[in-house]
From Swiss-Prot:
Keywords: 4Fe-4S, Cell inner membrane, Cell membrane, Iron, Iron-sulfur, Membrane, Metal-binding, NAD, Quinone, Translocase, Transport, Ubiquinone. SUPFAM superfamilies: HydA/Nqo6-like. One of its GO terms (biological process) is aerobic respiration. [4Fe-4S] cluster binds at residues 47-48, 112, 142. It comes from Rickettsia canadensis (strain McKiel). This is NADH-quinone oxidoreductase subunit B. NDH-1 is composed of 14 different subunits. Subunits NuoB, C, D, E, F, and G constitute the peripheral sector of the complex. It is found in: Cell inner membrane.
Amino acid sequence: MKNSFYQEDEILNNKLSNRGFLLTKVDDVIGWARANSLWPMTFGLACCAVEMMQAAASRYDMDRFGMLFRPSPRQSDLMIVAGTLTNKMAPALRKVYDQMAEPKWVLSMGSCANGGGYYHFSYSVVRGCDRIVPVDIYIPGCPPTAEALIYGLMQLQKKIKRTTGFKYDSRQTY
């Protein structure tokens, strides 16, 4: 059962929308803008990066979702970690993550990025990039398809739309 406040808000919204008005909250507008203008930065480490390139190509066209790949971490708000993360590469991943401006999100793509994958028991592999950076969305598969990546990005957009306020930090420790 919905709260009476939300029911009144819905009734008012319906009445005004019939007359050509739009009634919204600033949080909703900010969430909509953030979700529909993601600028991902690729951190392609292995074969999952090929699927990521396929998702950005003309057949799937991630640009239609408002996503534009950026070469610099200072210009991007989404990091897609695709592939096997080694112990030598982990400090570089953390450094790039720290250079990103807030709000920032991380998407872990593939079994290797999620938990080490096929190389889980190797001495040189980090068993999941979530040990180095906080991850918002996990995409399973070896390698995951371009459709799975786009589905994961759409789930991230839903998550971003649910956030409120100007500052986003779901990883606060108390």
